[in-house]
Amino acid sequence: MSAKQNILGKLRKSLTGTTPIADDFDVDLVTQPYTYSAEQRIPQLRKLMEAVHTEIHLTSADGWPALLAQLLRDRQLPSLLIAPTTPHGQRITQHWANNPDLPALKSYDRPMEEWKAELFNDTPASLTGTLGAIAATGSLILWPTREEPRLMSLVPPVHFALLKASQIRDNFYQVQQEFEWAQGMPTNALLVSGPSKTADIEQVLAYGAHGPKDLVVLILEDQ
């Protein structure tokens, strides 16, 4: 018998003859304090995210490529990493084609091993989509895919994230229910509230130690 089997056996034996406690979970108790109207969600999300140094911009489905281009110029960023086969990647490619003076585009379209040095040392910014956000906690929901892997939102020092206003949920319970995570947990979903930060024993706060030093969220007011 393995150590694992031995431990589980002891746990099962200890439960013999016991009666499970009824589950008195109260949905309203968990969700009512963290439920918002459509008009409240963006201000609530913005307040919490800006408190941890996230930069928020309100824009539109038509205007966000031009806004992104201006933000890149303002920060003097020489290039932007995109996922070219995503809808937002295609929008950026089209906008850039009509404005050849913009910073260079880099495509995440090959295995990381083929351009690891460039990705880690010469890729200053990236753009990804999001699955939505949670107003109650001020968090983006990132959902890495084969087209848009986790390294895109982790490695470049500046991460631009697109968020549709209609996809801002009230609370984490609503997200779990809507996506039916109880039936099968996602392999790599992330909740991100701000840029990477850490502090040493002297409580000196530093940004960018374990991820982007800047998080810039473009909220598309599509509702």
Residues covered by each model-derived region:
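The feature marks the mature, well-folded catalytic cores of soluble enzymes
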Residues: 1-223
